[in-house]
Amino acid sequence: MMSNLYTIPKELEPRTQSIYRQRVPRKIWQTMKTNAVPRKMGEWAETWIKLNPEYHYNFVDDDEVIQFIRTNFPGYLQAFERLKHGASRADLWRYLVIYKYGGVYADLDCLCRNPLKDWIDPDAAYVTQLGVNKDVCQWLIISVPGNPIFLRAAERALHNVLNDLASAEYYGFEFHRGKLELRRPEALIKIEDPVLGLAGPPILQEAAEDCFKNQTCPEIFEQTQVVCISEKTSCNFKGKVKHDYGNKDYLEGLKQLHVPHY
């Protein structure tokens, strides 16, 4: 039996009027099995709510995730229901909800340290960081709606599920003179993992590289804000957020919710 639970609000309208211009919709998205979560998760969710009062906050539980896909992307429903790992379901859902509505998606083990209005470029269509493997960020996604990268990621995940595949290959990006470029072929990274290689971060990076190479969304890359570039550890969007991956309280919370970690 779980104790010391925190109830995250399912939806909060903006608590203050926004007086600044920004292309990225002022929407925050988070998800978990249920919104009744261990206190640490609730405290981290509160950082997004309190520091960004001009944003519409949305918490989507497992049942609502399924309803969203059934209503908006019925062609993905069969594959989604075949996904057994909650993380993979959250992966696919985040691509689709950001593609449809845009805004800010944050994992529940990610806390906000600085208001979004202070560091999101008002003209940016896509805001990310480059990770240790020089891949775009998947635990915090900031984008306008209709970004082809996320539809491509969802399509790749769909293909993997329907064909029992769980692998990915990517090169990673370099950032020179304000522009993203693909790294050299010898930088190829190969991933084989039943969760990560199904719909996880490597799939998003593959999708981004597909769009980059095929020039299917040049305007997105021209208007991408790369906040920082990670080296040995995550640069955490230049300290504007903190991805506390592996936090013992968070891991214990997942156990309480009977949710596996990856």
Give residue ranges: language-model regions.
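Small-residue hinge/turn detector
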Residues: 91-103
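Glycosyltransferase-associated regions of secretory-pathway enzymes
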Residues: 1-90, 106-262
